[in-house]
Amino acid sequence: MSASNVLALTTLFLATMFAETEWKEFTSSEGNFRVVFPETPQQQKGTERNLHQFSAAAGAESYGLTYADYPPGTDWESVLNTERDSIVNGFGGSVVDEKRTSVEGYPGKWIRFVGQNTSGELAIYFVGHRLYLLHAFAPKGTPRPENFSTFLNSFLLLSKPKA
């Protein structure tokens, strides 16, 4: 078998092995959101701040969404910065890019960071009194997965929260 045939077969094998995962829409009426995950997410619930966590993996990539409720009048930017710092520092990392963003008119931040072994992106929004934190993580040194955008850009609110 020629070298070009071996290369073609290897490429075909790898393309099949790493074929795109069919992402699934996940809706939480209690959380008032919809997002796509690479598989049905695992769910955890905490008691503090009505904390809810949803997570799923696609190979070495990890995707998650957490939401928590804060008292009315909470300084949203302070909360977002605290969450950003906690996650980035937890990975022994540093922020390499940060931008203000929004979801349906509610303020947020998009953050890209690199840690000791992990690189990732965060999208954090403050909607009324609720914080939504989306994360996408991959091993450090791998090219940015296209799935990061698939996940982070899929987040939508089901309805405007009551004031």
Language model regions located:
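N-terminal secretory signal peptides that target proteins for export/translocation
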Residues: M1-S2
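A short acidic-to-branched-hydrophobic micro-motif
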Residues: Q53-N81, L133-H135
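Surface-exposed amphipathic alpha-helical segments
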Residues: S29, E39-Q42, L80-F91, Y132-A163
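Bacterial N-terminal signal peptides
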Residues: N5-T16
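Cleaved targeting-peptide boundary
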Residues: M17-F26
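Short acidic, Gly/Pro-enriched loop/turn segments at secondary-structure junctions
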Residues: T47-A56, S159-A163
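Solvent-exposed coil/turn segments that connect beta secondary-structure elements
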Residues: G31, G59, A68-Y70, Q116, ...
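Signature of long, low-cysteine stretches enriched in small and polar/charged residues
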Residues: E30-Q53, R84-G128
